[in-house]
Curated annotation (Swiss-Prot):
It comes from Escherichia coli. The gene is mcjD. This is Microcin-J25 export ATP-binding/permease protein McjD. The keyword Cell membrane applies. Residues 25-312 form the ABC transmembrane type-1 domain. It comes from the Bacteria.
């Protein structure tokens, strides 16, 4: 990973720590460092005690023995206490960082282009956050404890052993560090790559499971348990195979690290046994060396796996940050948004395609004026919904230009555009929360009186012959309400906004003709100066439009009043004859 990317990664993690988070993190580093030094000294103290008891030291005194015993007990107790305290600090830091990261991620999702939001399902999106959160936890935990502690212990061990003038043991410990670093540096890249591949497949499996749950009704209606089971089983098999490859290489690395430890630590062990037998090494020194071997062997052997885990987490987290980096570029705001609420819309030579093969819109030009209602109609796939999605800012990669009062749409920020244009679609976007919450989406400061007023305008003041309750809890996708009732929630949101342009993309299709006409009348009364664009095939809505545009294969093929088009346009006359 490049140095610049690493710095960006560490800056991102550091930015997730507030003052309390920084205090917790540096406290963890301090506790780990202090406890590691204390643990490293304990074998030396034990060696002194052993030599005193065995008579190897001539200056024996009970006071000195008691002092050493107290110091050794302090080392043991402080080690236990530091583990407990570290766990508390680590848990607090994780909660602290996870909260800030989740809110940051929510802002980043909110600021993403709508087309990007629709690429992945909720399962993939939420699991990405969980994985990134886990990556940060792995990095913080390993750096502050699992890597730092063995490194300090190894350095302290060499210093202590050198102080006893055991040059051979100190040299072997140093050689072990050198060989270990070279060996694991070469292998951790492969381990990290396999681990990242395994995590990516796990993420895809989770996304597939979420997709299956979302579409379970379709599977059930088609008796397709076998098909969806096979699909998910294939994903789990791929996940299993990827994990097997990772753990196989990880086991080999661990085995090689163990062999390295056995060879080098074993040579130190044998050297000191021979020293004791030859009378040149004291029993206490031998116990100190063996204590260091026991103390260091397991944590150091695990460093290889930990390094690969760290590299994988860094790579995965860097990708997450790159995908969800906040867009700090600010678009110029529209001066008239805070002054004039009347907007005219001009479209010039607008073309759009989802691929290079076929244009969905082909050089469309038209002028729409404030206070008027326009209807777009035409066969399925003619480009109606695509046109209004471009106007509302859903698609950015179009050719030509769109102007609001002579200001190009490209120069208008998403936030300002959302204030200027309200786009009602067939998608209800109902949250699993109360009716009150679902309506406050449109106006955070809306009072209960205002909410009840807009519910009445949307013909939703009564549900199941009872007055509606704002505390009604809506289930997944609002499915405890009918299709028409969910569309009325969307309409009620409209009445809580103050848009200059209103787009209705068949958003009243689940309502009957009477309710639809009443609501459209309420919209025109409530927003007398608004420019209204309506997509519909219903005659009653086309009749009350100031102008109807007929689209076919991405072109405007006819325009005018409905009565005139009944005579001159085959598609409109066909709609009228079907209705009759």
């Amino acid at each position: 990973m490049e140095r610049k990317q690493k710095n960006s990664l560490f800056n991102y993690i550091y930015s997730l720590m507030d003052v309390r988070g920084k205090f917790l993190f540096f406290s963890m580093l301090f506790i780990t460092s202090l406890s590691s030094i204390i643990i490293s000294i304990s074998p030396l103290i034990l060696a002194k005690i052993t030599d005193l008891l065995s008579g190897s030291l001539s200056n024996f005194s009970y006071e000195y023995l008691v002092l050493l015993a107290c110091l050794y007990m302090f080392c043991v107790i402080s080690n236990k206490a530091s583990v407990f305290l570290f766990m508390i600090l680590q848990s607090s830091l994780r909660i602290n960082m996870q909260k800030k990261m989740s809110l940051k991620y929510l802002r980043e999702l909110y600021n993403e282009n709508i087309t990007n939001l629709s690429k992945n399902n909720a399962g993939y999106t939420t699991q990405s956050l969980n994985q990134a959160s886990n990556d940060i936890y792995i990095l913080v935990r390993n750096v502050s404890q699992n890597i730092l502690s063995p490194v300090i212990q190894l350095i302290s061990t060499i210093v202590v052993v050198l102080s006893t003038k055991d040059w051979f043991s100190a040299g072997v410990f140093f050689l072990y560090i050198l060989v270990f670093v070279i060996f694991n540096t070469r292998l951790t890249g492969s381990l990290a790559s396999l681990r990242k591949h395994s995590m990516d497949i796990t993420l895809n499996s989770y996304s597939l499971l979420s997709d299956t749950v979302d579409n379970m009704i379709a599977a059930k209606k088609n008796n397709a348990l076998r098909l969806i089971s096979e699909r998910y089983e294939d994903a789990l098999t791929q996940e299993n195979n990827a994990q097997k490859k990772y753990w196989l290489l990880s086991s080999k690395v661990l085995l090689l690290n163990s062999l390295l430890a056995v060879i080098l630590f074993g040579s130190v062990f044998i050297y000191n046994i021979l020293g004791v037998l030859n009378g040149v090494v004291s029993i206490g020194h031998f116990i100190m060396i063996t204590s260091y071997i026991i103390l260091l062997s397991t944590p150091v052997e695990n460093i290889g796996a930990l390094l690969s885990e760290i590299r994988q987490s860094m790579s995965s987290l860097a990708g997450f940050i790159q995908r969800h980096a906040e867009n700090k570029a600010t678009s110029p705001s529209i001066p008239f948004l805070n002054m004039e609420r009347k907007l005219n819309l001009s479209i010039r030579e607008l073309s759009f395609s989802y691929s290079d093969d076929k244009k969905i819109l082909n050089s469309v030009s038209l002028d729409l004026f404030t206070g008027k209602m326009y209807s777009l109609t035409g066969p399925s796939g003619s480009g109606k919904s695509t046109l209004v999605k471009i106007i509302s800012g859903y698609y950015k990669n179009y050719f030509g230009d769109i102007y609001l009062n002579d200001i190009s749409l490209r120069n208008i920020s998403d936030e300002d555009l959302n204030d200027a244009i309200y786009y009602l679609t067939q998608d209800d976007y109902i949250f699993m929360d109360t009716l009150r919450f679902n309506l406050r989406l449109a106006n955070y400061d809306a009072s209960e009186n205002e909410i009840f007023k807009v519910l009445k305008l949307a013909n939703l003041s009564v549900v199941n012959n009872e007055p509606v309750s704002l505390d009604t809890h809506l289930i997944n996708r609002g499915n405890n309400y009918s299709g028409g009732q969910k569309q009325r929630i969307s309409l009620a949101r409209l009445f809580l906004r103050k848009p200059a342009i209103i787009i209705i993309d068949e958003a009243t299709s689940a309502l009957d003709y009477i309710n639809e006409s009443e609501i459209l009348s309420s919209i025109r009364t409530h927003f007398p100066d608004a420019l209204i664009i309506n997509i519909s095939h219903r005659i009653n809505l086309l009749e009350c439009s100031d102008c109807v545009y007929v689209l076919n294969e991405g072109n405007i093929v006819a325009s005018g009043h409905f009565r005139d088009l009944m005579v001159s346009n085959e598609y409109i006359s066909g709609l009228a004859s079907v209705t009759e």
